[in-house]
């Protein structure tokens, strides 16, 4: 096939730059795209030349050797092979392969060295991909997600969008300066991008899938339209994509700037995708409404509000542990957060904060981008996001601060629950900068055959909250993949020296004998946290009640109702549990049957960790209280009648349903 002739037929001969060529030839096109100054991309090759990273050439060499996501191909990349076929049988591996994120190290290495080996490898893989996955049959099939046997198809809208804005466009901005491009190379690449635009024009998820999909679809289509005005169809692409972007950038985020899926990773995916589209518009003189900029600013401020004392983000829903301090933000082998291209930094969370500072000037963005060295800490310690079901309290912003986060993921009615968990009133507790109670992570998706593991990591058992009768929170018979729980905040703030979050939810209302939990999460002066659980209901039947406590190390010891725990940094803590009904306790560490005692910091890796379950078989109502403190701290908690008494060297308080009072 002569790609050059086909491309020339598709060019807009009235485009001033094309018109100025006179007779259009392949060689002229190569020179033109190598040297063109407009339209303007998000960054230039000179920005990529500033990267300081000792390992990027080794990363690129692995790609040169076709060592990708832990699998080394024996020869050329086989685009239809999936190495998980005999284990997890996980489509996500192939979908990650199809996203071509590993072209980034090739482009980065070229920017630093100008070694044309990297260009040639990129071009070879680009041609190979297009030959393995020609778009024609998918362009004709208007089924939203074309049915394909394992390991799936390269032409889902999510992969199509991701390829465009995370690899194809950014690596082209770097590689276009190379001298090895032939007219056929360039034409094949641009025709490949045209295939992406045509597919996205004809296939739009429009909230039929997880809403992060459409952020990637719309941004990618708009970016192609802006960056390739030389193509006849680009005006139609622009008109469609511009409307979608400017509508969805507001529709997908709450007034607080929080993405509708309510999980940090996918929130950042959407924020970055939309921000790229907006910045590209501004760089090329295209109007952007005021609300769009403010949404992006607030979306970044939300991430700031979640950041823990160790400069990581909590694993709310399908989120890995993203760390500002490391070379890369996450540790996923594949299906990770790496869904952008920041030219000067491989850590997307850190680069995102720097970018937000450049765009908006808020000093907290600089504070996190520089790991507290510059800028200013946020002026607020505590955040109440009732609409979204996220609540955060802390003692300060330093590395030794106390931190308390609780969430009850609340999705809009009809929004698929794909990336949220059964986490209502989960407690994330950090004292003196040390993680104690944590979310267990996401581990793996239901696209794999390990659906039992997916179910476990999504369940209330894998969160620090109440689990009743093997009934998942908010489950309604006959209703699939909808998050039906709604949480009510009774109080958020300070009372008599205590910081209190007081919540209840409807997650067990559909049980034959309904159960109604209420939890007070209390920060006590002196690095102490107390959890008070009120569990109510008609009390007609016995239930299996379980309160879970998930830690992030295996250094957990259980003695009846007392737990000793040593943090990753070797700091000892202890927890005491009391109730007005008889509970039993159990410790699991890396148990497969029953499942329990696991943590996953990145997809698809899990490691053993301590999990304690406090169990009671009986009727509601009852009260339970848990105190979390440093080892040897004299603080205590006990139940007196219908109240809970907290004592420490900072004072004595009685906690009741109605509130809290110093005594």
Predicted regions located by residue number:
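Residues that flank catalytic or metal-binding motifs in active/ligand-binding sites
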Residues: 98, 217, 299, 387-389, ...
């Amino acid at each position: 096939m002569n790609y050059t002739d086909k491309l020339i037929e598709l060019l807009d001969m009235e485009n001033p730059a094309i018109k100025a060529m006179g007779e259009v030839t392949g060689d002229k096109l190569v020179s033109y795209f190598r040297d063109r100054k407009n339209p303007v991309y998000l960054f230039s090759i000179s920005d990529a030349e500033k990267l300081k990273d000792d390992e990027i050439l080794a990363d690129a060499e692995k790609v040169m050797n076709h060592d990708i996501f832990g699998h080394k191909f024996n020869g050329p990349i086989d685009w239809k092979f999936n190495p998980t076929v005999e284990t997890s049988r996980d489509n996500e591996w192939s979908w990650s392969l199809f996203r071509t994120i590993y072209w980034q190290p090739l482009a980065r290495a070229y920017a630093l060295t100008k070694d044309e080996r990297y260009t040639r490898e990129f071009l070879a893989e680009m041609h190979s991909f297009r030959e393995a996955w020609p778009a024609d049959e998918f362009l004709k099939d208007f089924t939203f997600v074309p049915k394909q046997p394992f390991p799936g198809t390269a032409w889902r809208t999510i992969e199509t969008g991701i390829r465009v804005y995370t690899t194809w466009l950014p690596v082209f901005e770097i590689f276009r300066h190379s001298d090895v491009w032939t007219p056929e190379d360039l034409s094949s690449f641009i025709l490949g991008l045209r295939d992406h635009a045509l597919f996205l024009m004809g296939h739009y998820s429009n909230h039929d899938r997880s809403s992060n999909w459409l952020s990637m679809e719309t941004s990618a289509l708009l970016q192609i339209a802006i960056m390739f005005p030389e193509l006849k169809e680009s005006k139609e692409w622009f008109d469609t994509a511009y409307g979608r972007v400017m509508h969805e950038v507001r529709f997908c985020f709450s007034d607080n700037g929080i993405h509708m899926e309510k999980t940090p990773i996918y929130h950042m995916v959407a924020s970055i995708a939309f921000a790229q589209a907006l910045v590209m518009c501004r760089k090329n003189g295209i109007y952007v409404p005021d609300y769009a900029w403010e949404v992006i600013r607030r979306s970044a401020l939300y991430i700031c509000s979640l950041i823990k004392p160790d400069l990581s983000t909590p694993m709310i829903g399908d989120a890995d542990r993203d760390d500002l301090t490391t070379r890369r933000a996450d540790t996923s082998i594949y299906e990770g957060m790496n869904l952008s291209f920041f030219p000067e930094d491989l850590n997307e969370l850190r680069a995102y904060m720097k970018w937000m500072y450049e765009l908006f000037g808020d000093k907290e963005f600089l504070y996190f981008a520089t790991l507290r060295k510059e800028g200013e800490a946020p002026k607020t310690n505590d955040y109440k996001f009732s609409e979204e079901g996220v609540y955060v309290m802390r003692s300060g912003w330093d590395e030794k601060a106390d931190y308390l986060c609780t969430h009850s993921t609340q999705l809009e009615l009809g929004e698929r629950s794909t990336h949220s968990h059964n986490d209502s009133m989960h407690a994330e507790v950090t004292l003196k900068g040390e993680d104690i109670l944590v979310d267990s992570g996401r581990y793996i998706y239901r696209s794999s055959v390990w659906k039992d593991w997916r179910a476990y990591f999504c369940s209330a058992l894998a969160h620090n909250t109440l689990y009743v009768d093997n009934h998942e929170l908010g489950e309604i018979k006959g209703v699939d993949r909808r998050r039906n729980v709604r949480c009510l905040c009774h109080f958020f703030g300070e009372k008599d020296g205590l910081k209190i979050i007081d919540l209840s939810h409807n997650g067990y209302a559909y049980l034959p004998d309904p159960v109604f939990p209420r939890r007070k999460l209390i920060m006590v002066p002196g690095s102490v946290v107390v959890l008070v659980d009120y569990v109510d209901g008609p009390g007609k039947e016995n239930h299996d009640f379980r309160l879970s406590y998930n830690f992030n190390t295996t250094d957990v010891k259980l003695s009846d109702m007392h737990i000793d725990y040593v943090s990753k940094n070797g700091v000892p803590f202890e927890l005491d549990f009391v109730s007005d009904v008889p509970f039993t306790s159990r410790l699991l560490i890396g148990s497969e049957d029953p499942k329990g005692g696991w943590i996953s910091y990145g997809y698809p890796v899990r490691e053993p960790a301590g999990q304690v379950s406090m169990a009671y078989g009986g009727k509601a109502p009852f009260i339970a209280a848990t105190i979390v403190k440093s080892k040897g701290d004299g603080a205590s908690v006990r139940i007196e009648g219908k109240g809970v008494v907290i004592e420490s060297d900072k004072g004595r308080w009685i906690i009741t349903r109605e509130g809290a009072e110093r005594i």
